[in-house]
């Protein structure tokens, strides 16, 4: 599996985007103005993928071009639907796949949806939605940052300010 980490500039901020990929993207990590966050989150993503794929991954650093896909999605050069063609979904649960597809196809740039609204649409609990959103391995492409709490729109892993930044880049303000 190839690990690619690139630095981009968005709204006077350094955005670090990392992808783990083969023919498609298996996972994405990002940070804003904090390259050490990427280094810290890489092992967590690898561990998640190894558990889901039930195998030890051999990671090599290289250039896959997939960080560019994530960046272009972030700045609106390509849609989430177009970018989603590049992600590997075979290891997702049926529920995760359903939720992530819904987000990609229905919650567009500049829009948000609450956990409760999404739960109602998917006929499940807000807690189930929250858990699946939190473990989303494809942030930015699968726009989990567009799912907000009714009382606090900026709850987010890894950091609330990341969610605020992503939503502002997309033109949404609370």
Swiss-Prot record:
Active site (catalytic residues): 144 (nucleophile)
Catalytic activity entry: a 6-O-methyl-2'-deoxyguanosine in DNA + L-cysteinyl-[protein] = S-methyl-L-cysteinyl-[protein] + a 2'-deoxyguanosine in DNA; a 4-O-methyl-thymidine in DNA + L-cysteinyl-[protein] = a thymidine in DNA + S-methyl-L-cysteinyl-[protein]
Alphabetical GO biological process terms: DNA alkylation repair; methylation
Domain of life: Archaea
Segments passing through the bilayer: none
UniProt keyword annotations, A-Z: Cytoplasm, DNA damage, DNA repair, Methyltransferase, Transferase
Compartments where located: Cytoplasm
MF-aspect GO terms: methylated-DNA-[protein]-cysteine S-methyltransferase activity
Gene Ontology terms: cellular component: cytoplasm
Record-linked HAMAP family: OGT (MF_00772)
Additional remarks: This enzyme catalyzes only one turnover and therefore is not strictly catalytic. According to one definition, an enzyme is a biocatalyst that acts repeatedly and over many reaction cycles.
Name the UniProt record assigns to this protein: Methylated-DNA--protein-cysteine methyltransferase
Gene that produces this protein: ogt
